[in-house]
């Protein structure tokens, strides 16, 4: 601890106490600051160490809290993702099942349509075959129907003529002034025509006329001027003959078709 460049009194000597000079004062004067500096350094180091430990502990706590927060968020995110994945898996399974059901329904519907198409084609082929078979019969039916409709028109015209004559005959029968001979002449004329006319003969009108002449005695009141209000049986026969005409038309057509 001696500085060779300094004067002797500035150096600390071990034996300065033996000289009885001011060396001790210098020693104490230098020792006190050094001790204060050492104490300050020790205190400062201790406080610094405490601050460092305190900051380190705070940092550790913050780090631990941050890590726990991250772990909690991570686990929450994992749980949420798992729930989302489970939900999506369930929805996907439902969609797959629904798609499978639709596919099966479409396949079944397609098979059904194919079967219906086959049946329709078979029915169409059968109808076409029946049409080819029926076509000649249809032509024959239309031809016979046309012929019988012509006959029906002639029969209706004949019935209209007989209706007019029978109405006149019944009017004479109910009249108090017209001669009986005129009525008998009309009756005779009607019977002759019913016998010689082929349509009237086919309807067997002669027997009906005879029945009318013998039994139709109905007349309107004395002041009646409407000839159509006289007679009852004659109107029934006229209606009956109209029905016979219609019936005979279809029976003749049927017989003609069956003969072919």
Swiss-Prot record:
Q: Which regions form coiled coils?
A: 49-135
Q: Which domain of life is it from?
A: Eukaryota
InterPro entries of this UniProt entry? Answer: CCDC127 (IPR034607)
Task: Using the record, list the residue span of the signal peptide; answer none if the entry has no such feature.
Answer: none
Q: Provide GO CC annotations from the record.
A: mitochondrion
Question: Keywords in UniProt for this one?
Answer: Coiled coil
Disulfide connectivity? none
The protein's name: Coiled-coil domain-containing protein 127
In terms of PANTHER family, this protein maps to: COILED-COIL DOMAIN-CONTAINING PROTEIN 127 (PTHR31958:SF2)
